[in-house]
Design a protein with these regions (language model features):
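A short, N-terminal "cap"/entry segment at the start of jelly-roll beta-barrel domains
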Residues: 1-31, 40-42, 112-144
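Short acidic-glycine-tyrosine-enriched beta hairpin
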Residues: 65-81
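A short beta-loop-beta micro-motif enriched in histidine and acidic residues
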Residues: 22-27, 37-53, 65
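Short, conserved beta-strand element in jelly-roll/cupin
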Residues: 33-35, 45-61, 100-102
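Ligand-binding loop in jelly-roll beta-barrel domains
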Residues: 73, 81-108
Length: 144
């Protein structure tokens, strides 16, 4: 059995972005950094179950029905595959999360809420940040 030990906050502060720390056929894990207040991803879901644990900062999870949940350090969210959500840094410091998801990273889909399409290939180098440009891009990609 192989065991690796990681200093997640050190990785987060040195890399400053989403960094995979583990990837097998059964599970993958990563550290996710949202540096600025207001940084958020798109409303989306994945095709696998997952968890997020807040290590630093404040994370607000938004849901399609307008609901939300605020998580602080040490709090964990479990998300069933197919459940739509959006993560946002609503704190005053960088938001650092550790996430893990069942299955290998390459098998995971990132389904956008508006288009209902897998958009994983649009952001290979880190999480998709919601900007006016990305909003316009997805408005144009809506299915007929």
């Amino acid at each position: 059995m192989s065991v690796e030990i990681f200093d997640l906050l050190k990785i987060a502060h040195e890399e400053g972005k989403r960094t995979r720390i583990f990837n097998t056929e059964r599970l993958h894990a990563w550290v996710h950094v949202y540096p600025k207040t207001g940084d958020k991803d798109d409303m989306h879901c994945h095709n696998a179950d997952q968890t997020f644990c807040v290590l630093e900062g404040e994370c607000t999870m938004h849901f399609p029905d307008g609901g939300k949940a605020v998580l602080g350090p040490g709090m964990v969210a479990t998300i069933q595959g197919g459940s739509f959500y959006q993560l946002e840094n609503t704190g005053t410091i960088p938001m650092v999360l550790m996430g893990n998801r069942s299955g290998p990273q390459d098998a995971i889909k990132h389904i956008n809420y508006e288009t209902r399409k897998d958009i994983k290939h649009y952001f290979r180098d880190g999480p998709l940040r919601v900007t006016e440009e990305t909003k316009e891009f997805f408005r144009q990609k809506k299915p007929d």
